Structures are given as structure tokens and as C-alpha cells.
Amino acid sequence: MRMLLPLLLSLLAAAAPAAELGYGTFHFPDPPRTVVGVRYPAGVPRSALPLGGLGTGTVYLDSHGRFTGQALANSYRPAGGVMANTGFTVTAAGAGGSDSRPLPALVQTYLGHFPMADLEAGGRGFPLGVQVRACSPFVLGDARLSATPAALFRFRLHNPGRRRVRAAVSFRWDTPLPSEATGTQAQGNVDGFLSWRLGDLAPGGEVVVPVFFVTARSLADLKQELARPVGTVDLDADGAFNWEDGGRQSLPAGQGGCLSQHGFYLHYGAGGPRRAGTLVVGSPRLEGLVRARYRRHDALLAAPDGSLQVQVSKITGGLAYRVRNTGRQALSDLRLSVYANLEAAHSEGDDRGWLDAGLGALVVTDGTGACCALASSRPPEGGWCGLWGGTLTRLAQDEGLLRNQWRQAPRGRGSRVNLDYQWCAVTREDPRHRAGCTAAVLGGRGVVTIPYQPFPSSAAPPEVVGVTGEVDLGPGQVRELRFLLAWFYPDARDGAGSFVGHQYARWFDGSLAVARFAARNWDLLLRRTGEWQERIYGEPRLPAWLADQLVNSLYPLARNTCWLYDGRFTQSESFIGCPITETIVCRFYGSIPLAMFFPELEKNTMRQFLRHQRADGAIPFAFGNGESWDSPYCETQQILDSSEFVLMAWRDCAWWQDRAWAQEVYPAVKQALAFARTLDTDGDGLINDQLSRQYYDCWQFSGAASYTSGIWLAALRAGAAFARLLGDADYEQQCLAALRPGQKSSERKLWTGRYYRLWNDTARADRSDTCLAAQLTGQWYAYLCGLGEVLPREHLLAALEHIGSTNGAGAVWGLVNGLCPDGSRDQSGSNGHSATATLGETWCYAATCLYAGRPELGLPRAERLARNLALRQGRLWNTTWNLDPDRGEMLWGDQYYSNMCVWDLWGALLGRRRL
């Protein structure tokens, strides 16, 4: 009866008319016995909860009970769309006949609390009540269990009628083919290149290759558009283009499509193999070339030894690449490769690209139907289609595929069935690497388990596996069926095609072994996953909106994490929005729950920063683009990178009370601070912002800026704290001596009397009096690290009030990033960086208000943001970097790393870092 009553109550609630969404408290018979959250009608949420764990890959389960994309098969980029031949079917057979329906036709409500989803189904004349709990093992404090590549599905079936019913649930799964670096197709942030073999070029000779960037409303229109390309593209002095340089996209067209980056490379022989071209990103941009001349319509580049020139010129619909031999000897085996990072309609999440052998083009399309292509009137001999972050290395190394390789047949698969009284499991895998999946149904008293066997005429492909569980239900009876999905794809590769693997392959030798582990530990995995949620939901000082946000905000730990075979653990900024490995300005915010709950993994990542620290002390901005772990670069946002590393190192030390950690990281801290001090070019004690971009990378600051200055001051305080802890009195005094003039300059240059202005460049007699919502970020971090106040208390309190009354004025759904003194929104940044609202900054503002003793300023704004995400947008499992402050709609940066900073509200409100 204890099991039956909650089920009956929840079924009655599901059958009630849909009301306005709100937070509720829901009860279950096992952990978490109480859930505080939003129970959505099916189809209302605009995001799907990811099932998966730390570095395992994920599969999405949407509010209809459908599997809507996966990132399991050696790829971290999700393959979107509802998965065909996949899902659950429920059948009820009795004296009146048999009724069989797919689960999505039955689901009525959906309650997501990562990593669990509770679905209520039935009604609509169906003779059974159905309650489904889907869960992946995820245990705060236990990284090993949290990295189990499996999902568990529990069905509770209720017979409300007066007659006996034979109930069956069938589970079918279309096993994804293992993703390999084939170079013929990709899904996500697609890029690629086309290549031409131009032969030998005699002295004085030249060759021209025209390249077109074409957009079309549909694939059907593309061939016609290729015949008459129109439009223009942007071109810089390096014969290339990178949207980040100007904060805008190229290739505007009425039918959609945009061009984020383009560039080229040459490979040839001249007394030995040579290469020359543009790297598009990083510094320096050019290899083997120097700028000779630049006009808006063309760029002339030359080899330093005078052996060749490359002229890149704008033509209708594209660019022309003219290569001249300006030397005295022939250039042998000349090859040209042209690169493009294209989007079909500026919607990165579902872009799909491929090398089309028929068109001789790199084609990109998305769910809108719009498409674009990189093509030429001169047929290419080769090319590559990949994902941004790994393709540029191949471009520079001339590692494309010949055109006759642009078509590949899928690999064969082997399958086997395991059937005994305990369970029925069907495994489908690639015999080479044992890569594949196992679907299983667990046995039990009165449970009949059956492997899925498609009829010979079935249209299901051979990769589909499936199992069925059957039980008898008497009148009023409740019975349970348990299913699980396990996966094993051990051959993951980095962007350059080198093996990186998965950590879980050290514990398991195939998906069947994963399934056995999950089956034997079913109760333990569900119980421990639910218990930490109970501690959050049971905390009386947490409002409902915050409890719901804390639990669900952890989803990026499944979506964006990588745990490699060699043990390295990292997070991506956003695998579908901006795939960069451990972007430090995002980690600064988003690593808070990792430091709280998985300290060994936090140390793991921080040690990688130690390993990648440059000889001059500079800390890298990231470990690499895309799926890259050993290509660090330090120039991007260098005015923040080293300071933020120091603050994270001290945060970890302070929270863990770990003197050994302090001793390990202290030498790197001193080197990082020494490098950061070199960025004070005018001697005012503050870092100069014009030296690089910062967190708002499409919004340039100059001179001293409130955002970066505050972080620098807090970092100096952290350096002094390290020195004091370790008994280094001389270095403590050095840090404090550097801190004092910096604080004075900050007050003199940035304090307006009500708030800290955006920036002030006294050398140029120029400044911006914009009020930045995040101007107190350095003070926020000083608070959370236990470093006290680095700004005058009366000023930071005044600034908090001013931010609330200006950046938070009106009915905005998040603090507007920049407000001018006249109350208008700052438009000086591009891509919305100045005039939109960054989600994380509202969470951080609220936390700062709590630390400063002004909760009434921050908590209402945090609550408004949380309600927008949960009740208006339905985007709890896909939060972006920024949103439209007026409409509340998500904008750029899907599934974003930094938003996990909401977890600092737990510490600020409760005064502790543990559950």
C-alpha cells in the first residue's frame, strides 16, 4: 500500500487539467522521496534531460519519453533529432483484447531532476497506469560511480481495473555506429576544406582557383545557386577571415547561412617540402608568408624568400586564389587547400555537413532546411569535413581525403543474446573494438523476459537491439519492470585523430560488462543518486526555485565532460555552442560544483594547467579548440587567465583546507602573478585591458577596467594568503605592496561616486561610464574564497544598489550587461555582449549581495531568472551564456559551462560548501 498510494496520487495529478506552471513538491516511495521542481505537461519543456555521467557521453530523454539524440559513440557532439527505431512500447492484454502504444503516446507529465526524470503516463482509454523513472548513476562525491556509461529505466505498472491484465513493456535501441575521424561527414559546429592539386609551377607561372561560398533555402535549390553564385565575403590582411576579430559573421544572405572563418594553406616543393598559409586563429596567424599589400578587395602575401606570392581577391560569390612563382626555381607538386567554418542558418546545434562527391563541395544544412556550401568551378581533388577545433591542424598538415574516398560503407556488427532467470540482455557491437550497446530487462518473480527478434520483413536495421518484459497484474495491483541501457565506445579520438579513449574502458571490457555491473548494483546506484538530492530538497532554508535550479544546473557535468583513458579530466565550454577545452574564463565560474563535490577531479584539471603553464608564467586560456587537450594557447584573454588561475587555486585550498595542495600549486601561483604584473604597462598597479579581449570577447575595453581590475586585486590578495599559509613573509609583503597602489588606482580611475565605470584609459583621455552588471566579479570571488573585501565596503554596497536599480531596472529577466549613464543599453559590444543579459552574472550578483549582507537586493533577481528558465522557457537542461533581457529567450552558447556558478548561492546562503 505504501507503494500504491503515491502512484495513485501522482496519476490523479497527471489526469487533472493543465494549470499554469509552478513549483511543486512531489513524493515518491524511494530516494529522492521528495522532489521540489516543475512537473511539465508533455511537450512543454524546450530542452531534454541528458542521461549519462562524468565523461561517458549522453543520450537525451525528452518530455514525451523519446530519445532525441545521443553523444555516445566516440563523439562528444550530439547527433540531434528523434532517434528512429528506438524507444519503449507498452502493451496491455486482457479479456477485451490487446492495446499496444508507444510510450510517447501515453506520457502526460515530465518531472526532471538531473540525472533523473519521472514520467507519468496512461489515461486516454489505456487500461494501465504507467510511472517511469529514468536515471543515470550520478553520485556527488563518488566519481567512479558517476562515470558509469549506463541509463536505468524503471516502469511501475498499475492495473486500476477489475480484471486481470497481461502487461508488457518492450525496449528497442538503434545502436549508434562508432564515430571515427572519417572526414566525410560531421554534425555540430561543422567546418572543413577543399583541396586542389595544381601540379608544378615554373618560374613566372601562375595558377588561379576560384572558390564560392553559396547559400540556398534548401538542398533542392543548392545546385541552381552553385551555377550562379552571388554575394560577397569579408577578407582581412592575411587573406582570411575570423568573426571574432570584428565580432560579426560574414556571408549575409536572404536565404540564411553565415561564414565564421575562412583561410587557406599551400603545400609545395622547393628544395624540400614547404608549407605556407593562414592558421585563422591564434597568434601568429601566418606561417611561411608575410603581408605584402592589403586593400579591402584583395590581400597580397609573399614568401619571405621571394619564392612565391599569393593574391586573395574578392569575386562575385566568393574569392579567387592566385598563386605566382616569383622565384628562380620551379615549385613542384603545388597543392592549395581552402578552409571554411560554415553555418546553414546560424543555428550551430543541429548543423550537419558532408563532402558531396557529386557536387564536389562541402555542404552544410540544418533542421530549418537552409543550407550553404564551399565549392568551386574547378573540381577539387580532395577535402575534409569535420568539427571546429580539429580541422585546422589537418589543413596545415595537408591531411585531407581524396575525392574517391568521400563515400564509405558502414562497418558490420556482431550481436549476442544473454538470457537466464536473472535477466535478458541483447548486445550489438563492432567486433574490432567491442564498441556498441547492450539493452537488458531484469528478471524477477513473475517477470518473463524476451529478447527482441525482428520479423524477417521488419524494416528495422541490423543495429537495433531490444528486449521485452512481461508481468501479470491483478485488479488494483502494481508491478515493476526494470530496463537498462549500457554503452561502450572505447576508441575516442581527439580532433587530430589521435587516440584519447574513455576512462570507463579501464573498468569495463564491453557494454555487456557495464550492463552486468548496473544490474547487480541497481538498488545501490538509484539509492545513492537519490540521496544527495534529498539533502538539497530537504534543506529548509532553500526556496523551491533555488533547490530546483541547483539540482538541474549540474547537467553540464554529463554533457560537457571528458575523462580520457590516460586519466585526464576536462570540461568543454560548450560542445555544441563553442567547443573549447577548459576555457579558463568559463571554468572560473563553472568549476564551483566540481571543487565542492569532486575535489580529485578538480585537482586533475588544475594540474593540467600547471603542466601547460608557459615558461614566463602565463597560464593558458584553454588546452585547445574542439577535442584537443595538448594545444594550449595563452594570448586569448591573457589579461584574465593568470589572475583567475590564482583565484581558483586559492579557492580550492581554502575550501578543502588542504595545505599539501597549497604547497603543490604555490610555485605556479607565484609565476602566474609575476606574468600578470607584466600586463600593467602604465605602472598604475592595474592590468591594461587593451592588451587583449576579456570575458566579453566581442566587447573591447581599454586602460583600467572594473571587471579585470577587481579580479586582479583579488588575485593579489590570494597570493598574499598563499604566502601567509606557507610562511613566506617576504612574498606576502610583495603581494600586499602591489595590492595597495592597485586599489588606489581603481578608486581614482573607476569610481564614479555611485558605481565603478566600465573602463578608463587615461593615456588616451578616453573612458566609458557604462555601468557593468559584473563590475564586482573580483569582489565576489574574494568573498567566496574567504579573502574579505578588496574594495571599500561603502563603495561596493553603493555599487550593488546602483546595479540593481539600473541594470536590473524594469521587468528584465536578468541583469543587463551594460547600461549607459542615460539609462540606455550599451551598444558598443557586438553579438549582443553589451546589451543582453549573461545568466551567470545574475547568479554572481545575487551571491555577492548575500555575502555583503544585502540579500534583498540579489535574491529577487535570481529568483526571477530561475523562474524564467524553468517556467517560461522550459530550458533547465539547455541554458545559454546570455539571454534576451526583455523576452527572456535564450540566445548564444547552448549547454554552457559557466552557468554552474549558481552553486555559489548554496555557499553564500548556507555558509558551507558540502551538502
Task: Set out the residue ranges of the language-model regions.
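Non-catalytic carbohydrate-binding regions of carbohydrate-active enzymes
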Residues: 730, 734-763, 794-915
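Acidic/polar, glycine-enriched structural segments that form the non-catalytic walls/loops
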Residues: 18-34, 38-39, 47, 123-131, ...
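Short acidic/proline- and small/hydrophobic-mixed sequence motifs that coincide with surface turns
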Residues: 164-166, 329-333
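Bacterial N-terminal signal peptides
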Residues: 3-12
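Hydrophobic, small-residue-rich alpha-helical packing segments that form membrane-like cores
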Residues: 691-725, 735-738, 742
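Non-catalytic C-terminal accessory modules of carbohydrate-active enzymes
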Residues: 55, 66-68, 74-134, 138-143, ...
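Substrate-binding groove/exosite segments of carbohydrate-active enzymes
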Residues: 34-80, 253, 308, 451, ...
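Short beta-strand elements of extracellular/lumenal beta-sandwich folds
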Residues: 149-158, 315-328
